[in-house]
């Protein structure tokens, strides 16, 4: 590559390259190029106007103003960021021979070798200055290229890791959604089956339980009625027996009183007869007390 009118040099001898010139030769999509251009730090990128631009003075600006359009200029660092995005023969020449030839042309214009006191070939002095400048430029270019390669490699690795992570998360989300759908369908199926079973089983069981409850209630009522009748009969028998015993006791008392009256009148009952009657009275009284529940313990 030979020097052309797409570069300019500022007061610090920093070379600035037209970004449009790099875009036209890099064969890069416009959106990608613009994204890279605006990602370059501002100290390595500047915007100038072709007409009336104080930064483009006749001694240092190598290309003439053409119109009033705005141009973006980048230094060697910015040019490396743009050119190394898609490595090609142009990017290799841009960062080597293109830069060297433009600096050589700039040095020949801006730093003429003073005439020495003694006659010496002017080529030797200019060659020494050019070689020193080129050596410094080569070292700076190597550092810039190495830094950009490392940055590009790190960014590529980070993008790859991020892409893999996103793909993994996407796959896990798909698996989770599928599992949730399967679980939901299974739960709904089981619930529907359970509801159907309950609806089918509860009416029969309710009728059976009601029938058994009615039978049990009838049996309990029958037993209670029977027991109630038996108890009433037993109570009646006991009441009648107690009344009979009371009547017997009254009869015996009357009989005893009559017998004692006879004995008081000088009747024929002796002590032995009287004792036998008393024993009969005691026995009947004891039987009555037992039947009426008043027996002595």
Swiss-Prot record:
UniProt superkingdom: Viruses
GO molecular function, one term: structural molecule activity
Keywords tagged on the record: Membrane, Viral envelope protein, Viral occlusion body, Virion
Subcellular locations according to the entry: Virion membrane
Disulfide bonds listed in the record: none
The UniProt record lists the keyword Membrane: yes
GO cellular component, one term: virion membrane
InterPro entries with a match to the protein in the record: Baculo_PEP_C (IPR007601), Baculo_PEP_N (IPR007600)
Pfam families: Baculo_PEP_C, Baculo_PEP_N
Family: Belongs to the baculoviridae PE family.
Entry function: Major component of the polyhedra envelope.
Record's protein name: Polyhedral envelope protein
């Amino acid at each position: 590559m030979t020097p052309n009118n797409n570069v300019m040099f500022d007061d610090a001898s920093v070379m600035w390259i037209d970004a449009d010139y790099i875009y036209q030769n890099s064969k890069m999509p416009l959106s990608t190029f613009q994204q890279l251009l605006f990602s370059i730090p501002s100290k390595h990128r500047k915007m100038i106007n072709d007409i009336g631009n104080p930064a483009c003075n006749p001694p240092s600006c190598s290309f003439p103003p053409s119109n009033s359009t705005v141009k973006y200029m980048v230094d060697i660092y910015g040019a490396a960021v743009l050119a190394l995005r898609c490595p090609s023969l142009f990017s290799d020449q841009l960062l080597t021979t293109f830069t060297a030839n433009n600096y050589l042309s700039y040095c020949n214009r801006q730093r003429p070798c003073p005439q020495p006191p003694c006659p010496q070939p002017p080529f030797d002095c200019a060659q020494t200055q050019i070689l020193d400048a080129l050596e410094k430029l080569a070292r700076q270019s190597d550092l810039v290229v190495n830094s950009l390669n490392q940055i590009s490699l790190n960014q590529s690795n980070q993008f790859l890791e991020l892409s893999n992570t996103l793909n993994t998360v996407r796959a896990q989300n798909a698996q989770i959604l599928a599992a949730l759908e399967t679980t939901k369908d299974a739960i709904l199926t089981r619930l529907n089956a359970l509801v159907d079973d309950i609806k089918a089983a509860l009416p029969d069981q309710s009728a059976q339980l009601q029938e058994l409850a009615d039978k049990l209630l009838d049996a309990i009522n029958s037993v209670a009625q029977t027991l109630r009748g038996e108890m009433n009969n037993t109570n009646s028998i006991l009441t009648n027996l107690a009344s009979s015993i009371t009547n017997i006791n009254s009869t015996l008392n009357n009989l005893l009183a009559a017998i004692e009256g006879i004995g008081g009148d000088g009747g024929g009952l002796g002590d032995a007869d009287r004792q036998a009657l008393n024993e009969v009275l005691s026995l009947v009284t004891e039987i009555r007390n037992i039947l009426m529940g008043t027996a002595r313990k």
